[in-house]
Amino acid sequence: MKSSVPSLLFVSLVMSLNSYTQQVLYCPPDPAPENITEFVCNSPSLHEFPTGFPVRTKIISVEFTQVSSLGVEALQGLPNLQELHLSNNRLKTLPSGLFRNLPELHTLDLSTNLLEDLPPEIFTSTTSLTLLSISENRLAKLRLSWFETLKELRILSLDNNQLKEVPISCFDKLEKLTFLDLSSNHLHRLSPDMFSGLDNLERLSLENNPIRCIAPKSFHGRPKLSIISLKNCSLTNIITGVFQPLNHXVLLDLSDNELTMLDPPVAIPSANLSLDLTGNPWACNCRMDNLLTWVKEHKIDLYSKQEIVCAFPKSFKGEEATSLHRSQICPC
């Protein structure tokens, strides 16, 4: 099974941001030793959010518990808190002022909970955030107000929710964002407004969405975008030139869609572009020949060539497309 490159990148980025050197103590003892600044509370039987964290606390991990709510004062008196990990709990909602007075907070993980919505002003005070994960929840919509003050954010993970659309200009203020994960939602189309403001975006994961339409200029204005995953997105057709601005792309994953034909994605690709076309029902005709000629001329790295097989015409069904001679698929 092929690994999801964007997902692996997200894991590596999280790990790099969370390389701890301080001693870890499990849950806050009373009193806590002077040299302890990180606390891990991950008992499966824990139902209430712990209290008594010392003012010097920098990292709190309350994960894999039965905690379903936090009081609005739960994090007050912790001005040095830098990382808060609340994944794999039973959280259904969060109070509006929960994250106030946390000027040093740069990492917030709310993944794998039961969140269906969040208060409009929930992140207003978290202006130092560089990583925010709300993946694997039940969000059906995004609020513009969530992202208005997150100008330092680099990594945003919204995968595995129930999002059907991204509001116009939703990410406008995220000028420093480099990685955006919207995979495994219910998005049906991409439009230019969806990614407006993301001038520094480098990695974009959209896999496992029922995307059938990519509007022209959807990727315009993203000069640094280098990795795009559109794997398993129900794509049947891609408009010529939609990827044209991506001259710096190093990975374009179009695997496991319903594509039968594809024009060369970019006229002048980057020197190290990799392209995944596996798992599509390709029509092996002159248009496919043009694509393969482009691949050969620009020395594009094709993933798993043996899995790029013809579905049409019947005479070539099951044949490896790259093994066919030009005279066979385009005799004219």
Curated annotation (Swiss-Prot):
Other known facts: Concentration of this protein in the serum is 8-fold lower than in the E.quadrivirgata (another non-venomous snake) serum. This difference may reflect the difference in the food habits of these snakes. E.quadrivirgata preys upon snakes including the venomous snakes, whereas E.climacophora only preys upon small mammals and birds.
Source organism of this protein record: Elaphe climacophora (Japanese rat snake)
SMART domains in the record: LRR_BAC (SM00364), LRR_SD22 (SM00365), LRR_TYP (SM00369), LRRCT (SM00082)
Keyword set, alphabetical order: Glycoprotein, Leucine-rich repeat, Phospholipase A2 inhibitor, Repeat, Secreted, Signal
Assembly, per entry: Homotrimer.
Protein name: Phospholipase A2 inhibitor beta
Gene3D superfamilies registered for this protein in UniProt: Ribonuclease Inhibitor
Localization annotation: Secreted
